[in-house]
Amino acid sequence: SDWPSNINHGDDFTSTLNQAIINDEHIPNTRLTACDSPSIRSGTDILLFPHNIRLLSISMLDIPNLILFLKNEIPNPFKFKEIEKMIFLVCGHQKRDDRCGKCGPMVLSSVQETISNKRMSDQVEVFKSSHLGGHRFAGILVCYPSGNWYGRVNPSNVEKY
């Protein structure tokens, strides 16, 4: 991807949403990460965990209501789909850290190949993600809905995960 070194600085959707989350002290323990999952329609789709839903076609104009929803102050006002597959995120954020930029694509390819070989494509989706933290442990793999984080993943040990 061509994510800048810090996806949270700028005037795009991701930066604006992240700033709104940071500025609201009533949204604790929330992390915003970009991934290369394509949006189903126009706007931005948001994979929301642990809710296990994909919010569909969210725009800049939706951010105030999204913040209210994240704070549980309003019911979900957005179109959404249940996430029925496991989601694996592999950090491949080259501009943030070279280690993830080098390890990530190899791990991503190996995970995709393993899923295909095990005929699990109907159960798992794999995406490259922006910075997940802990780049000294690259390759980093995060699995949802379990929320398990794995570090130092490499093509030779992918099948363990």
Question: Model segments located where?
Answer:
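Histidine/cysteine-enriched polar flanking segments
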Residues: 1-161
